[in-house]
């Protein structure tokens, strides 16, 4: 199947060492909430990009109808519910650190009895004393393990709740964007990275996680470069990339050229239109789809 969405980079992504970032393609995002006006959808692009090619609206409309599956959100919810039921993964299990249990043969053997002048009663008394001490230490170890198990479980549950909420916001944002083949690109990205990486991106970049995963899924070489970095360097690159990704309305170009002159006529409506357009551009740059659409409706009302 020929992809209908791409992401475009206008500069090399700076990487640590000798890593040179690959330039990205352009990404087109369809506005599926307005099937009658596919030309008025959105594109996710990197700032300063001016060369994003237009896509076939009919194909975009077809892909836009695909439902985002919220896979990672469901996985996180299922993991949290399993832990609440007591079904703990190995990573959460805490085993008691038990001391070695006394061996009666060490007391009643020829060598052991020699320590007690071959007196069986003395040897048995020594064994019973050692075993009683072991039972007390074992009980303490088990109590400590239970306490640590409870602490780890509570910590996991609290952290899981944060990840589930981050995943919910992530998919809510993805659905608002209505990226035609979003699920395909997210799946491609998730196959490249450990599950924890995707969850961390959702948590650390709540406003741009959907765009980041789409971009990296469409450009797997960038995802591989990030995986090759240490954690701090990868976080810096992800932050830089998130700042460059932006929305732009379909059919328009984001330009670094100075803004057009303000209307110099006495037409108040013309000035209002210009102000609303600027607000629309600002909302698009922030990825605020809801505000953009409200302003767009307001602009139509002035016309």
Swiss-Prot record:
Residues 1-74 are annotated as: Post-transcriptional autoregulatory domain. Induction: The scaffolding protein negatively regulates its own synthesis when it is not assembled into proheads. Homodimer. Homotetramer. Interacts with the portal protein; this interaction initiates procapsid assembly, thereby ensuring incorporation of only one portal ring per capsid. Interacts (via C-terminus) with the capsid protein; this interaction allow to form the procapsid, in which the scaffolding protein forms an internal shell in the icosahedrally arranged capsid protein subunits. The keyword Cell membrane does not apply. Required for procapsid assembly. The interior of the prohead is filled with the scaffolding protein. The scaffolding protein is lost from the structure during packaging. Scaffolding protein exit is followed by the expansion of the procapsid into a mature capsid. Keywords: Late protein. The keyword Membrane does not apply. This is Scaffolding protein. It comes from Salmonella phage P22 (Bacteriophage P22). Residues 275-303 are annotated as: Interaction with the capsid protein. It comes from the Viruses.
């Amino acid at each position: 199947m020929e992809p209908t969405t791409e992401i475009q980079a206008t500069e090399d992504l700076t990487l640590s060492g000798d890593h040179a970032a690959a330039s990205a393609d352009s990404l087109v995002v369809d506005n599926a909430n307005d099937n009658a006006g596919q030309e008025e959808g959105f594109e996710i692009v990197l700032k300063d990009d001016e060369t994003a090619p237009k896509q076939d609206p009919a194909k975009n409309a077809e892909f836009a109808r695909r439902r985002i599956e919220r896979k990672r959100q469901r996985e996180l919810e299922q993991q949290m519910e399993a832990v609440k039921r007591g079904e703990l993964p190995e990573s959460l299990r805490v085993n008691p650190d038990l001391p070695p249990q006394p061996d009666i043969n060490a007391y009643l053997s020829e060598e052991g009895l020699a320590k007690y002048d071959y007196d069986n009663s003395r040897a048995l008394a020594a064994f019973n004393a050692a075993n009683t001490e072991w039972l007390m230490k074992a009980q303490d170890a088990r109590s400590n393990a239970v306490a640590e198990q409870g602490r780890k479980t509570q910590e996991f549950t609290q952290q899981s709740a944060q990840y589930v909420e981050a995943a919910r916001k992530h998919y809510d944002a993805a659905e608002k964007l209505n990226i035609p083949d979003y699920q395909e690109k997210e799946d491609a990205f998730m196959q490249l990275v450990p599950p924890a990486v995707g969850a961390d991106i959702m948590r650390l970049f709540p406003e741009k996680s959907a765009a980041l995963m789409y971009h990296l899924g469409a450009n797997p070489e960038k995802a591989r470069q990030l995986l090759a970095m240490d954690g701090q360097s990868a976080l810096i690159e992800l932050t830089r990339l998130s700042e460059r990704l932006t929305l732009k309305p379909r059919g328009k170009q984001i330009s670094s050229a100075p803004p057009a002159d303000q209307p110099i006529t006495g037409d108040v409506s013309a000035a209002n239109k210009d102000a609303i357009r600027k607000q629309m551009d600002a909302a698009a740059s922030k990825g605020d789809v809801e505000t953009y659409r409200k302003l767009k409706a307001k602009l139509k009302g002035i016309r």
